[in-house]
Amino acid sequence: SPVCVTHADMRLDNIFFKDGEVAIVDWQSICTSAPEQDLAYFLTQSVPQSVREQEDLVALYHAELTQNGITYDLAQCRQRYVVCALYLICYAVVIAGTLDLGNERGRKLGETIVKNTFRALLELDAFSLIKA
């Protein structure tokens, strides 16, 4: 199974766009992990359902990975994406627990992260991976 360098805090607050260019900041959590980790983090915690539904973003990501030398099939990428998304639920809970819920921005960020994450996990049927 492929691994790569991951940002490990790939949320919209850490991505800046200007004139067609993209800058990613806040690299203190960098590590090696599954390539799908950053994608799962970004799509499940920062991207609303309406955007996730527009295109097959996992397939687009997989195409970029394979064009750049990572060789594995799309089905494996999709499965690993769901596993990463399920694992990252702990990030949503931990992050929401550290925010200042007394101010509007902190409260809204916490609500957004938790709602987006659970909605995405339900869409992916990720909880079916947990054995009773």
Q: What kind of region is each of these model predictions?
A:
Residues S1-H7:
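ATP-dependent phospho-/nucleotidyl transfer catalytic cores
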Residues P2, W27, Q45-E53, C77, ...:
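Conserved aromatic-histidine-acidic binding/catalytic patches
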Residues R11-F42:
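Catalytic activation segment of kinase domains across protein kinase-like and atypical kinase folds
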Residues V22, E53, D73:
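Short acidic alpha-helical/loop segments enriched in Asp/Glu that coordinate divalent cations
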Residues C31-A34, D73, K108, T112:
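Secondary-structure junction/capping motif
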Residues P35-G69, A85-G106:
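Active-site activation/catalytic loop segments of kinase-like enzymes and analogous catalytic loops
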Residues I70-A85:
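All-alpha amphipathic helical-bundle segments outside canonical DNA-binding/catalytic cores
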Residues L88-A132:
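ATP/Mg2+ or Mg2+-diphosphate-binding catalytic cores
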